[in-house]
Amino acid sequence: MRNIKMPKRVLQGVVISSKTDKTVTVKVERKFKHPIYKKFVKVSKKYAAHDIENKYREGDKVSIVESRPISKTKTWVVVNVE
């Protein structure tokens, strides 16, 4: 059996909270066309991401990448600021 690794997902979003130690909350928005109404709908979701150096603040545009589970809710790591 081959060991083929799947590529990790990368998302872009805005930091909306950096109050916790080594964790930021990132809001990721996506747009899609509604299948029935044919109107573009904007949906957002919040992710808890690991920030090991506590250097990101509210309002920063960041990229997050999928990783192993770090805690109960954290499975994303901040990789860079846009």
UniProtKB/Swiss-Prot annotation:
Taxonomic placement: Bacteria, Pseudomonadati, Pseudomonadota, Alphaproteobacteria, Rickettsiales
KW Ribonucleoprotein (keyword) present: yes
UniProt function note: One of the primary rRNA binding proteins, it binds specifically to the 5'-end of 16S ribosomal RNA.
Quaternary structure and interacting proteins, as annotated: Part of the 30S ribosomal subunit.
HAMAP family attached to this UniProt entry: Ribosomal_uS17_B (MF_01345_B)
Gene name per UniProt: rpsQ
Keywords, alphabetical: Ribonucleoprotein, Ribosomal protein, RNA-binding, rRNA-binding
Family from the record: Belongs to the universal ribosomal protein uS17 family.
GO MF, any single term: structural constituent of ribosome
GO biological process, one term: translation
Domain of life: Bacteria
PROSITE patterns xref list: RIBOSOMAL_S17
SUPFAM superfamilies: Nucleic acid-binding proteins
Name of this chain's protein: Small ribosomal subunit protein uS17
A GO CC term attached to the entry: cytosolic small ribosomal subunit
